[in-house]
């Protein structure tokens, strides 16, 4: 049986496109993550009185709220130029849907493109310092092989990522109240490179980025983020959705026995 590393290497050397490998065995657990995010929408009742529509009020409230998060469901999607998650630039990140419990527990379903022509899905689980990745052929979980930077806990870091990102925003403008999975405050500002690297799990590096945020008017929680990145003229577009704050997910290590 090929290891997860050798299976990915074999897929990189595969020619031809259009094939999506099915998830099997333990990875099917993570496939359930995807169906819930689509059902997460807004509602007309905000649950309280909205805060003042002023960046001077919204930003401190959002920074405090995001720094206090204990669990969240996320969906991060990339369009445009590919962004790679392996050291040989063969495994391009397309999308991740997952759940995070702070501290140190997360699971995610990753859509990736191998060698530019083969679409597949990988399950990733992180639990108290250990990370496992699903074998793309068997679907069974195995310890994360060397050379792959896929730790799903990095997709959401409240204290080390989100709070300082919001506190460090520059040139912030308030763009109005919009319907974005419910009524949300829309702000735009420039995020510093160091903090953006943290909140994108190191997928975006070495550049300050203009970011659009949608913030819940009562809780201050960020529910959507959009931005573009430019790597020597190759532009990637990013969309992040956040939902189910405070839910209990009961994330556990994968069953390595299948």
Language model segments and positions:
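C-terminal motif of bacterial Sec signal peptides marking the signal peptidase cleavage site
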Residues: 36-39
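Subset-of-secretome marker
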Residues: 41-258
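Hydrophobic helical h-region of N-terminal Sec-dependent signal peptides
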Residues: 28, 32-33
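Bacterial N-terminal signal peptides that target proteins for export
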Residues: 4-27
